[in-house]
Structure formats: structure tokens, C-alpha cells
Amino acid sequence: MTVAKAIFIKCGNLGTSMMMDMLLDERADREDVEFRVVGTSVKMDPECVEAAVEMALDIAEDFEPDFIVYGGPNPAAPGPSKAREMLADSEYPAVIIGDAPGLKVKDEMEEQGLGYILVKPDAMLGARREFLDPVEMAIYNADLMKVLAATGVFRVVQEAFDELIEKAKEDEISENDLPKLVIDRNTLLEREEFENPYAMVKAMAALEIAENVADVSVEGCFVEQDKERYVPIVASAHEMMRKAAELADEARELEKSNDAVLRTPHAPDGKVLSKRKFMEDPE
């Protein structure tokens, strides 16, 4: 069996980057893929990012990946910009996973020959010390992950990389094979994620709220300097994400009530199977 290989680099934290490799082998039983993961935890300054990318490229010399993925916030920031530069100069096809600020460098990434998946609802949290402790950070990310999972955003990411893996198994990946995606509320209008239209609009509402969380967090973290104002502002951003998660959960519950939840597991050979009825076998 032909095996596709990929290296995932995680610098800083996005909901999508936390899950991007695991979405592709959810039961750890695929025989057609092999991955390596390196990262810097939550750090994304240029020095840390450069060290992580260098580590990935060192691993690549022996591992010989078919492609490399870099995931983290704000692809336009200095650290991620360094990663883009290093990956563009490497011999490996590369994809950047980012959030809404990455739109500022979308054209630049295309000029660099990079693929990209920009997830606009993958929003920054309210990182003020007076508000954000480890527990609050974890709760926010749990809500964010529910939004991205239950609305189908993660499935879009899964499908994009599964297509790339199939290309790698068939032949060498070209620049034209790399995904170039911007995911937002309207992405759901182009897909058949939900059978119940009310489930779809609840999911769309969840994504719209989540996308706007980023603007509120930026205001509270970087614009407003009065503590009496910025603490409530960042806290309100987290309340928005909590409500978005509730809407996303309601959307999935509607699909459950109709026995229509879409599931797309991987077979051991990597084939993406599909089913909706709870007790039927995926095909």
C-alpha cells in the first residue's frame, strides 16, 4: 500500500491547528498515512517559529514527507511570516492553516506557492491577565472546538487534506493541488452538511457569532486600555463563543432527532466512508 507522509507544525494555538492531524486518522488505524508533529506550544515569536520549522525540515530529510502543514494564528504576523518564507523556500509542498488575519496575506501566500486554509470563525480569545487563567482558556477552546466540529468546519478541513493525501498517493503534489480555502458562515450554503434547514441556519448563526468574537477580543486586548472597560469586553467575547457553541450543539441535536447526522469515517486504506442513519454501516 502506498503511504502518504506529512509533517504538521503547530506554533501558537488555533482550534483548527490543534486538531488538523487528528482529523485525518480519528481511530489511529489508517495504514495509508504517516505523520510527524512538531511545535512550540502557544509561542509564535519569530525565534520559536524558526526553530520549529528548522526542526521540521531536519526531520524531513529522512522522513521525506509529501507535504508540510503549518498551523497557527495570524499568518501575517512576524513569526508565521518567517514560517511562510522558510516553507516557500523549501522543496516541499506546504499549506498554511490560519484565521481571519491571514486574509491580509492571501495573495502573498499564492505568490509564494503555498496552499492555505483560513478559518474565519477560529477566533482569538480574550487574553487579558485579569480575566484569562488556564481554566478559562480551556473552557473557551472547548466551546470553540464544538463550534468548528458541530458546524462542519472541521469536515471541510478533513476533506481538503484527504484530497491532498490521495494526490500524494497517486503522484507528486503540484502547486495547483494545494488547497486555497477561506471558510466562513456561507461555506455551509455550498455543502450538504445538514439535512434539516433549521439545523443549517443554527450552524450558520454559530459561525457568524464565532467570527465576530475575534473583533471583540482584539478590541479588548489591543485597543481598549482602561481596565474597567477591557475586562468586561474580553469576557463578553467568551460569552459570545459560549452561545455559539450552544447553537452549534442545537444544530447537531436537530440532526440527531431526524437520525440524519453525517459521519465520514476513514477506512484503513484511507477511503472516506459516509453514512447518516445511526445503525447503518458507512459506505
From Swiss-Prot:
Region entry Disordered, spans: 255-283
Record's keyword annotation contains Oxidoreductase: yes
Cross-referenced Gene3D superfamilies: 6.10.140.120, F420-dependent methylenetetrahydromethanopterin dehydrogenase (MTD)
GO biological process, any: one-carbon metabolic process
Keywords: Methanogenesis, One-carbon metabolism, Oxidoreductase
Pathway the protein acts in: One-carbon metabolism; methanogenesis from CO(2); 5,10-methylene-5,6,7,8-tetrahydromethanopterin from 5,10-methenyl-5,6,7,8-tetrahydromethanopterin (coenzyme F420 route): step 1/1
Regulation: Strictly dependent on the presence of salts for activity.
Protein name: F420-dependent methylenetetrahydromethanopterin dehydrogenase
